[in-house]
């Protein structure tokens, strides 16, 4: 698959992204590398913790394939710092409190929470090529086996 599966607004690549550890980056700063961006609802919740740990366990394989990983939620940098320290994540988490990145990737969805309709992050992952094209998207992600599936897709795309 070489065609983009999601067209991102050009401005998305220059959005300032606040990372765990207090640094900033942009998507453009990752040009030339494969990039896995996974969106998750909330730090330190069971599913989000498992997903992060699964990506972290496979980080050497993602590195070997030339990919960087960014996890994204609406939590604060401080929350991300605590989450990373507690779980030992070796990749950065993006604090998207203003939802700019979430909206660019269209992951803010209406969800049913305790009988009420609320807007929240739909667990989603996107694989960006070194040229910045979204070449694969996973929406409504089920955590079990997901990081393995993303790694397999990365390897398949990298061979093309």
Curated annotation (Swiss-Prot):
The effect annotated for residue 48 to A is: Abolishes catalytic activity
Q: List the disulfide bonds.
A: 48-84
The UniProt entry, under CDD domains, shows: PRX_BCP (cd03017)
GO cellular component annotations, sorted alphabetically? Answer: cytoplasm
> A biological process (GO) annotation for this entry?
cell redox homeostasis
Family named by the database record = Belongs to the peroxiredoxin family. BCP/PrxQ subfamily.
Give the protein name, as stated in the record: Peroxiredoxin Bcp
Organism per entry: Xanthomonas campestris pv. campestris (strain ATCC 33913 / DSM 3586 / NCPPB 528 / LMG 568 / P 25)
Organism ancestry = Bacteria, Pseudomonadati, Pseudomonadota, Gammaproteobacteria, Lysobacterales
């Amino acid at each position: 698959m070489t065609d983009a599966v999601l067209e991102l607004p050009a401005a998305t690549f220059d959005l300032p992204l606040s990372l765990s550890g207090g640094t900033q980056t942009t998507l453009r700063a990752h040009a030339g590398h494969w990039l896995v961006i996974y969106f998750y609802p909330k730090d330190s919740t069971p599913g989000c913790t498992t997903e992060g740990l699964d990506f972290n366990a496979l980080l050497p394989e993602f590195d070997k394939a030339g990919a960087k990983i960014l996890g994204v939620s609406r939590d604060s940098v401080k929350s991300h710092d605590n989450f990373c320290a507690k779980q030992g994540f070796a990749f950065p988490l993006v604090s998207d409190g203003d939802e700019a990145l979430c909206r660019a990737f269209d992951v803010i969805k209406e969800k049913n929470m305790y009988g009420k309709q609320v807007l929240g992050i739909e667990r989603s992952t996107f694989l960006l090529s070194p040229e910045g094209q979204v070449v694969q998207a996973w929406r409504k992600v089920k955590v079990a086996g997901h990081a393995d599936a993303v790694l397999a897709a990365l390897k398949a795309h990298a061979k093309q």
